[in-house]
Structures are given as C-alpha cells and as structure tokens.
Amino acid sequence: MAHFEIQDLTFSYAAAKGRHSLEKVSLSIEQGEFLVLCGASGSGKSTLLRQLKTVLTPGGKRQGEIFFHGVPLSQVSDRDQAAKIGFVMQNPDDQIVTDKVWHELAFGLESLGCDQKTMRARVAEMACYFGIQDWFHRDVATLSGGQKQLLNLASIMAMQPEVLILDEPTSQLDPIAASDFLNTVRKINTELGTTVII
C-alpha cells in the first residue's frame, strides 16, 4: 500500500484570486521510495509538500484528495502525523525550539509521550547515528547552519517516522554542508528504509 496517494489535487492560496498553485496533481508515493520534486522557483514544490502534513498546510482553497495509508489525511490525527510523517523545513532556525542539543533531540519524543527509557535510547541512538555526540551538551545557538539542519534531521528521525519530507533543506547551507546533508538523507533511505520526499 502506498504511503501517500494524491488524487487530482488542486490548490490556490486565498490571496491568489483563482490562480492555482497546484492543478490536478495525482501521485502515488510507495514505501521506501526516494522521490525528488524538481521545478523552478514558485512552481509549487513547497506548496505540494506542505499539503502532506495538515498542521503545515497553508490557508487556501483545496480540491482533490490526499490519502495516507488509504485513509484521508484529514482523518489522520495530528499525533499520528507527528509520529509517522517527519518534515524538515528550509531554514534551520525555523524548526529549533529548545536551547540545548540533547533537549532538541528529545523534544519530539516528549511531545509524543514516550517514556524516559525509550527517549534516552532513541536520543543516544540518533546522536551516534548522526555523529553529533561531541556537541550533545552544546547550546543550539553555537551551532552552524549545517549543524542545526543536521540536528533538525536527527530530532525528526528520533521519532522513527515512516516518511521524511524535506522542503529545500540545503537552501541555507554552503555547498560542502549541503552535500554532506544530502548524503545523510540518502543513507536514511537506504539503511533505515524511510521513504524520502524532497
């Protein structure tokens, strides 16, 4: 069964006066896929990605359907979406909510109500997997843009999502940090089997 099934999705922003940002988009995204959306600036890539998580969906008029595991996305609880659909934003600073690296790694798990033992295990596992143990106790404000984006990714992956959505995650990074980040995303897809949409 597909993670996402998008059927004839049309969307226009409230201020767009009838101009569609997305028009009759149909797409099936299967488990384990690595899907890259390409297009010019303003072509609707970010708008489409934000449709895949209801708390991030912009205001506007939408027609068509989006299904997650065969269920209309609008009927999937926010908690289930938080646990199963990870989303990394363009700007690393837009997603960080705590002051310490370790707390940022644990924040999503706390929000999901995970017990302490599970939280500690997942935080340690992600710190090791992403190679960020050396800055585990650092203030988030001292991190570079690339480190912050890697922390965002590790924090999302600590929740073990089935799908990882990334909205131009390297747009704020230098070329070396961007390359390293994308290699890490590919590793998540191949080693962990996480579906990636970027």
Where are these regions (language model features)?
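A short, flexible loop at the N-terminus of ABC-type nucleotide-binding domains that lies
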Residues: M1-I6, F11-K24, L56-G59, S77
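The feature captures the beta-strand-to-loop junction immediately N-terminal to the Walker
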Residues: C38-A40
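Conserved ABC transporter NBD signature motif
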Residues: K61-P72, Q81
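Conserved ABC ATPase "signature" region
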Residues: K117-W135
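Conserved ABC ATPase signature
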Residues: D139-L143, Q147
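Conserved catalytic motifs of ABC-family nucleotide-binding domains
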Residues: Q160
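Catalytic Walker B motif of ABC-type/P-loop ATPase nucleotide-binding domains
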Residues: L164-D167
